[in-house]
């Protein structure tokens, strides 16, 4: 049975919520999970993005599949729902290199795109857990801004 206090976010999607709701996504491998949070208003969002750049893909729909467009979309949604741009902070998780000989480096490119987009928007990354070679599940708490990171063999941690 699903927990009504937890909103699930699928791959290539995002959600925003207010305290006390939590937002969860699973399966962050080369994908990147980005949380944006206004600590004062207790509103935040989580984005689970697949690919680094919407312009290079030549696709106009579903911006949340793409790191750059997805972050811009998520920030706009949070502001539209009462968040203050000046008070927004970001956390970044994922971007793993899941396969040793991958020439595309999607994880690295997703991380780079996220950092560039957040910098362009003037948002500070206050914590991150990126790269490496393992998957992650994350649960974002809109009450505290904490981000619980769960892994199969490495245990859990909060950033």
From Swiss-Prot:
Spell out the coiled coil positions from the record: none
> What reactions does this protein catalyze?
L-glutaminyl-[protein] + H2O = L-glutamyl-[protein] + NH4(+)
Signal peptide location: none
What Gene Ontology terms describe what this protein does at the molecular function level?
protein-glutamine glutaminase activity
Question: Known EC number(s)?
Answer: 3.5.1.44
Query: Which keywords, in A-to-Z order, does the entry hold?
Result: Chemotaxis, Hydrolase
Q: Which cystines does this chain contain?
A: none
Q: Give the CDD domains listed for this entry.
A: CheD
What broad class of enzyme is this? hydrolase
| Lineage top rank: taxon | Archaea
| One example of a Gene Ontology biological process annotation | chemotaxis
Q: Which family does it belong to?
A: Belongs to the CheD family.
Role according to the record: Probably deamidates glutamine residues to glutamate on methyl-accepting chemotaxis receptors (MCPs), playing an important role in chemotaxis.
Q: What is this protein called?
A: Probable chemoreceptor glutamine deamidase CheD 1
Tell me which species this is from.
Answer: Methanosarcina acetivorans (strain ATCC 35395 / DSM 2834 / JCM 12185 / C2A)
Instruction: Print the organism lineage.
Output: Archaea, Methanobacteriati, Methanobacteriota, Stenosarchaea group, Methanomicrobia
């Amino acid at each position: 049975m699903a927990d009504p206090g937890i909103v699930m976010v699928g791959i290539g999607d995002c959600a925003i919520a207010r305290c006390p709701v939590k937002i969860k996504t699973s399966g962050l491998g080369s994908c990147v999970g980005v949380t944006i949070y206004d600590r004062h208003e207790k509103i935040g969002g989580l984005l689970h993005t697949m690919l680094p750049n919407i312009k290079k893909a030549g696709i106009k729909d579903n911006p949340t599949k793409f790191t750059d467009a997805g972050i811009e979309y998520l920030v706009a949604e949070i502001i539209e729902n009462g968040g203050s741009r000046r008070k927004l902070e970001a956390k970044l998780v994922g971007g793993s290199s899941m396969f040793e000989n991958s020439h595309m480096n999607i994880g690295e490119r997703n991380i780079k795109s996220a950092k560039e987009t957040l910098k362009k928007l003037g948002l500070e990354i206050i914590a991150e857990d990126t790269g490496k070679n393992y998957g992650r599940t994350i649960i974002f708490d809109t009450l505290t801004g904490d981000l619980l990171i769960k892994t199969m063999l490495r245990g859990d941690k909060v950033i």
